[in-house]
Amino acid sequence: MSIITSPKLKSDIDPQWFEQDYWVNQGRLLGANCGRGSTWTIKSEWGKWVLRHYFRGGFYAKLNRDRYFWLGLKNSRAYKEYQLLDEIQRLNLPSPKPIAALIVKHGLFYRNDLIMEHIQHQMTFAQGIKNQYLPNDPSRDKKQLDLKYWHQIGQTIAQYHHNGIYHSDLNAHNVLLNHDQVFIIDFDKGAIKPPNQHWQQNNISRLKRSIEKVSQKSCDDQLSEQWQILLEGYHV
């Protein structure tokens, strides 16, 4: 078992923190979001955190839900995401602060978890798009997606790209909006790469496809105008 954290927290980290049941029994489990990687919002003594357990997706999930082939500690998913988030914090870019990662080896395989800071936010970019374009969607609420956010999102992505931060799944669900702030989350499989127009454009194109999927519109004049505002922010 390996725990990755800052030297300041090393003596304080309890392996039980990586177990959902621990927080349930403490009455400190605040919520859950179960996608491919299940995450739980928890209330620690130091504030709100997010606990993430890494699950497989696609075909391999049918064979093995959460075990990965062991290729060394530094190649484990949680280790790499922790280190990337730590570097992003050093660059002062808007993302969750990593708290600790747990990697447990079982023979030829391992499972892993990550604890990170909870980002206070009003809505995701995806929720804002739904609120605007899908009036009959049951998950729609009254929060409005201000035009300023499109420009800010473009600027924020540009800051990441300028520093060579590659996001493997840049989509509208992984962008959080809070008043005048834009945060990007979920850096699993992310990396630091030499800035390159090819992967950067692929990132932008992936986000555009996500926006079209969430809004259920691909040839809409208003959406096209808003997308141009995002690109203007990106190219400032």
Kindly give the residue locations of the regions a language model identified.
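Broad phosphate/nucleotide-binding scaffolds in NTP-utilizing and phosphate-metabolizing enzymes
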Residues: M1-Q16, W23, P96
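Conserved ATP-binding subdomain of kinase catalytic cores across diverse folds
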Residues: F18-F125, A158, H162
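Short, glycine/acidic-enriched loop or turn micro-motifs at the edges of active sites
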Residues: Q120, A172, K189-A191
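C-lobe/activation-segment region of protein kinase-like
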Residues: D141, V182-V236
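Conserved alphaE helix
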Residues: L145-T156
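Conserved catalytic-loop position in the HRD/HxD motif
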Residues: G164, D169
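Hydrophobic residue at the +6 position relative to the catalytic HRD Asp in the kinase catalytic loop
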Residues: L170-L177
